[in-house]
Amino acid sequence: MKKIKIAFLLVATVLSSTLVSAQGTKEYTVDGIKVIHKYVPKDVISVRLFVEGGTANYSKEKQGIENLTLNLMVDGGTTNMPKLDFKTASEKIGTSFGASTALDYGSISMTCIKAFWDQSWNLFSDAILNPAFSENEYNLLKEQLIANAQQTMADPDGSLDLLARQIAFENKDYAKAYDGTPESLAGISLEDVKNYYKKTLGKKRTFLVVVGNITEEDLTAKIKASLG
């Protein structure tokens, strides 16, 4: 039931809140990876890898580790392509990548056009399977996220939201700051990030949602060749 709820939220983010129940949405499994696939005859393709668990995946001391890990995966280069090369390759074909976290889930997303689907998928799967996790990019991103957390704490609305959850869900997972606090982020090492990636980014905790002008056969072949 929880998976269905999460899937609904994800697809709603990609298109609209009515998409899940629309005709043409399929659910299937490819080499142990759950796939939710919606075919639409448009040139824009949206892909998102969902990581289940959210705040339940880490301790209070490691708040923000999922945020740091996922963003480093999409914005820190891979073992095959340094950050600048990866960014240049994606910008050249108009493909965008993103990462986000929430109370119950985290995700890595990609949006591309049909003409560059093959190249975009290769970049997407490379970011998921072969993140570089370089110390330099880790330090740069960590400093940025700490600055963001400090700004959130200084903002009345941002700090009020966290305080309300801490009171309502005292000693529960929902009381955690999924973006991290300045203190928790400062205490997360690069080794922590690598270990979190190995522990969390597996088939049991993830599933894929794809919306666009691609066939089940094409998507299945790509998953088997890369993520499977």
List the predicted regions and their residue ranges:
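Charge-rich, well-structured scaffold segments of protease-associated domains
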Residues: 1-5, 88-228
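M16/MPP (pitrilysin/insulinase) zinc-metallopeptidase core fold and M16-derived inactive scaffolds
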Residues: 48-111, 177-178
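N-terminal targeting signals for Sec/Tat export/insertion, comprising classic cleavable signal peptides
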Residues: 29-55
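Boundary at the C-terminal end of the N-terminal hydrophobic targeting segment
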Residues: 20-24
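Bacterial N-terminal signal peptides
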Residues: 7-18
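Short, conserved active-site loop motifs that form the nucleotide-linked donor/cofactor pocket
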Residues: 25, 33-35, 206
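Solvent-exposed loop/turn segments at secondary-structure junctions
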Residues: 42-43, 55-57, 79, 114-117, ...
